[in-house]
Regions:
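Conserved alpha-helix/loop element of class I SAM-dependent methyltransferases that forms part
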Residues: 29-65
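Class I SAM-dependent methyltransferase SAM/SAH-binding core
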Residues: 65-121
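A short SAM/SAH-binding and catalytic strip from SAM-dependent methyltransferases
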Residues: 131-146
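A short glycine-rich, Lys/Arg-flanked "PGG" loop and its adjoining helix->strand segment in the class I
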Residues: 146-161
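Short alpha-helix
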Residues: 214-237
């Protein structure tokens, strides 16, 4: 079933602005103490789940490195990387998410740039601008990934790295209500899944709320194969559970990849 909906970027911008107002987990800024520890070299950031990303996936010394936190607003990863010495740009679709980064930067005296936009269009940046793109779990909010990978490849310098977190697409097989409310794994959806094609606007409003963000599953071909097709070389793979999802006792809910732009 498919209905006419607003552009997903516009819809999800409003949804995430609301999440910030509600205090969503991924919209809670790091503390001043976290920033101070990062300045002293004691820091960690999350790419998938709640586990710190493997520090070997990032440059040993971040000082002077140009880092793009892609679809990564909320005042979490960007400020920590800036405190660790990187030149950070946070790019996000939600003004309020970016506002969290701006707040931390002002509070703690960090140099940090924020840019509003859709992750599929990075035309705000020139070719070979960044050394690292840090892209935590967020591409479930756009329907197509090929533009994301093409743009990431373009804006990275040769030898630059792309760190990506994404949902295991199998999570979308299951009935959301049965899973979230009763912990039951009931297969009801065909993959790849989309809120837009699976439910009408009225059904979405009933099941998730009219203001909930639109989500899209993506195949592993789109996630990993898409990076390879864009020109990246895959050098790392990790997985993690979803701490509050009943399916975690049977499978990993998150994957992470590390890829390099040759050169």
């Amino acid at each position: 079933m498919q209905d006419i909906v607003v552009d997903p970027a516009a819809h999800n911008r409003a949804a995430w602005d609301k999440y910030v107002q509600e205090g969503n987990e991924w919209s809670r800024p790091v503390s001043a103490e976290d920033v101070e520890r990062a300045r002293m070299g004691d820091w960690s950031i999350v790419l998938i789940g709640r586990e710190p990303v493997d520090r070997s996936w990032l440059p040993t010394d971040l000082t002077g490195k140009d880092v793009l936190c892609l679809a990564s607003g909320g005042g979490q990863q960007g400020p920590i990387l800036a405190a660790a010495g990187a030149r950070v740009t946070v790019f996000d679709n939600s003004p309020r998410q970016l506002g969290q980064d701006q707040m931390v930067a002002a509070r703690d005296g960090l140099e940090l740039r924020t840019v509003l936009g859709d992750m599929r269009d990075l035309s705000a940046f020139g070719d070979a601008t960044f050394d690292v793109v840090f892209h935590p779990v967020s591409n479930l909010f756009v329907p197509d990934l090929a533009p994301v990978w093409r743009e990431c490849f373009r804006i990275l310098r040769p030898g630059g790295t792309l760190l990506v977190g994404f949902l295991n697409p199998d999570v979308y097989l299951f009935d959301h209500e049965a899973l979230d409310e009763r912990g039951e794994l009931i297969v009801v959806h065909k993959l790849p899944y989309s809120d837009v094609t699976q439910y009408s606007a009225e059904e979405r409003a009933t099941k998730f709320g009219a203001d909930a963000p639109l989500e899209y599953s993506h195949t592993l071909t789109a996630q990993i194969g898409g990076q390879l097709a864009a020109g990246f070389v895959l050098t790392g793979l990790a997985e993690a559970p979803h701490q509050s999802n009943a399916s975690a006792q049977y499978m990993s809910n998150y994957f992470a990849t590390l890829a390099v732009k040759p050169g």
